[in-house]
Amino acid sequence: MDVEAKCPMGGGKVEGRAVLFEMTNRLWWPNHLDLSVLHQNPPAGNPMGEGFNYAAEFESLDLAAVKQDIFALMTESQDWWPADYGHYGPLFIRMAWHAAGTYRIGDGRGGAGAGTQRFAPLNSWPDNANLDKARLLLWPIKEKYGRKLSWGDLLILAGNCALESMGFKTAGFAGGRVDIWEPENDIFWGPEREWLGDERYSSDRDLAHPLAAVQMGLIYVNPEGPNGKPDPMAAAHDIRETFGRMAMNDEETVALIAGGHTFGKCHGAAEPSQYVGAEPEGAGIERQGLGWDNSFGSGRGVHTITSGLEGAWTKNPIQWDNGYFENLFEYEWELTKSPAGAHQWTPKNPEAASTVPDAHDPHKRHAPMMATTDLAMRADPAYEKISRRFYDNPDQLAHAFAEAWYKLTHRDMGPYARLLGPEVPSEPRIWQDPVPASDHPLIDDADIAELKAQILAAGLSIARLVTTAWASASTFRGTDKRGGANGARIRLVPQKDWAVNEPTELATALAKLEAIQQDFNAGQTGGKQVSLADLIVLGGCAAVEQAAKKAGHDITVPFTPGRTDASPDQTDVESFAPLEPKIDGFRNYVGEKSVYSAEEMLVDRAHLLTLSAPEMTVLVGGLRVLGANYGGSKLGVFTERPETLTNDFFVNLLKTSTSMKWEASPDADVFEASDRATGEKKWAGTRVDLIFGSNSQLRALSEAYATADAQQTFVDAFVAAWTKVMNLDRFDLPR
């Protein structure tokens, strides 16, 4: 077949092989706004079907039986990939760590929550070399338990089982990670176009936000030191920044490094570039998803090549003990190189030369090794102080590592209410953003109607009520399930002081809502109460209803009580800081300049809110006419009847194409529309506003809401999207 002549998509050549390809819109127009991230992992791509309830399936699982199967598997060494020291535990710990360790607190992306280590690019990162073998070893477990046990849960459970099988007591395990079925395309892993590049740094080694890893394809830091330079103090700087961006403090960082490096070994039998083949995504079809084919010797066991470093940290690499710190502090270390040419450290002390068993040959012994990043635990004063305390107090290390490991492997799962299974700890941790349990009768329909009337009579505008509710609920991030209206943390530090929330106006609104709350609660005799969290959302719903009524629509915005109010003691201020919106297109707010366009940041915010492109579109149009802009700005308020729920934003934006001319103002991100005939200025808008008339896909959606018969459609769609955002964190409700 003549591919170029007969294929409607066109043809090309890759390494002499005919392939089909498509010149996508993205290739033709690289600056084209990408909305595809709002429609990832559609139901049609899920082989489990739309009615699949993973939580119910997992709860039916005999977790103890699963663990016994994993325990048995870990000590059954396979010839095709022999276990170091006869135990796959260290390999499974690395697999679980690297699955969870992609999490970053800046945008909540990454982590183990969707089983994405099995997809590109993660399955082919240099730092994940040979973890394809770990997942293949686990296939019999996955095959046996099927839909009851997701890959996301299995990877972390295997790590926990590995620790337990080697004598460590973990803090617990929770299931509930729902697998996705295609790679995540919303995650910016870095600007580099080659593995281990580090273009993510500006001057003074300032790491670009929201990245956490130091180089493309690494989970954390380069074990040889920054850019391969064996400088322990410089490595400490990278470690602190990287682990900090993954939500870990100094004590948690030391505990994780020491605890993880108590087990297993590094593999650097020979120079990788001479012997190691392509990663899984680049390997031949006959490799069946396996990569890093190694032609050195047997290619496995003693000949394994992974990181390039070679050796174990402790005398007993498959037993929990304090050997890591014993070796770190009792020996003096000097720089050397592994057989693969990687920088690492070896003891100066001759008595250390034969203290470590060989991973495969019982007749051989070795000296322990340390990476440059391990020596950072001794070189950096703060890390050294913590390390010596752990060395002197092994029980403190065990507790700190158990808690840090639990945090590492569960940080991206969101609130405690989402955790499943018999091994969930009895109490939530502060990093899970706990809220009090609801322990009182909830308000009923009559109470809701009365409270709505009181709120609307309290002297707060429709715009202020809408803005307050939006500010509270829209902190939610679908990535790590944090934020949202539950807890009413908008009244607490730091949220009450965020610039985007207009602190003075917010305080006034909250004071009036709190007065209504106090009066209502004081008047109850049967224990019934209403939380401020519920009142904030109810106020927004009442305002939307009032705005719709002004437009001639008698509607009821769905509202479900049951939110509670978190206390300052339940709120980690530092942990909440990354949730602050520095740019929010829904409120036409730009607090700081970004390397990304305002419209790109709008799409990013919409993705965090789990919105589709139609939902994003209808919310922007509705919020504009409701007056929910930051600071009461008129930018994008394309209506003569503000605080009225109309489709005027879309109607008037699309009319300007023929009757008006848009021009940039001195502020390049603000545009003004003037009458083509008279020159009279009519509207002003931002890039976020104009993108709905400029981008062909968003214009099509705008047209759908702008037609003469679309007003009811618009109102219904706005209410549905509004309700979705208000309830994003309501994991107590049926889904």
Curated annotation (Swiss-Prot):
EC code: 1.11.1.21
Molecular function, one GO term: heme binding
Recorded catalytic activity of this chain's protein: H2O2 + AH2 = A + 2 H2O; 2 H2O2 = O2 + 2 H2O
Active site: H98
Details of cofactor binding: Binds 1 heme b (iron(II)-protoporphyrin IX) group per dimer.
PROSITE patterns on file: PEROXIDASE_1, PEROXIDASE_2, PEROXIDASE_4
Official protein name in the record: Catalase-peroxidase
